[in-house]
Amino acid sequence: RSTLFPYTTLFRSKTLDKIKEAYGGVLFIDEAYSLYSGSQNDFGYEAISTLIKEMEDNRDKLVVIMAGYPDEMERMLSMNAGIRSRVSYTIDFHDYSSEELVEIFTMGAQKQGFVLLEETVAKLGEVFEAAYANRDRHFGNARAARSLFEQTKLQQSNRLALDEEADLFTILPEDIKEL
């Protein structure tokens, strides 16, 4: 027995408690690969072993969704034969297009009462096209659109502080910065 035994037993118990909380619903594990370092002597191995057993024994009570970057997820599934056989479906979600990112930004702005000029929408298209063309595996997708919107509101506030007559709810092209 390892000196970690009491801790791994406690960790297994806490993992099982969390899994049981999801009975009748969905257990969502974001960046699931971060659970497992590849060693059988870590807590992540215990978490995955516990998860595999629950996925098998209680498949009628539990839906498990694991999310993460494709390469890391594939590595995780390859590290444990038991988990691969219990994962029925894998779905690859593609990045949003630049047009979809403009739409996400625009919907968020309109929801908060902002007006975007045609020129502003055109500038958004340019910014998102550049971001999309230069994206890497950490590209933020909808998060990038929301982040740009938050930056834009700050930029717009700075502009409004210098121009008392400007419309408070109109976003101008100069309010949009590069991602």
Name these PLM-found stretches.
Residues 15, 30, 51, 64, ...:
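Conserved RecA-like P-loop NTPase ATPase core
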Residues 75-78, 84, 93-138, 157-163:
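Conserved C-terminal "switch" segment of AAA+ ATPases
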Residues 131-179:
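C-terminal helical "lid" subdomain and adjoining coupling/linker elements of P-loop NTPases
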Residues 33-65, 71-84:
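Conserved catalytic/switch belt of AAA+ P-loop NTPases
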Residues 11-28, 48-57, 82:
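Conserved alpha-helical scaffold flanking the Walker A/P-loop in AAA+ ATPase domains
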Residues 4, 33-35, 69-74, 95-101:
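Conserved nucleotide-binding/hydrolysis micro-motifs of P-loop NTPases
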Residues 3-10:
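Short, small-residue-biased leader/transition segments that mark boundaries at the very start
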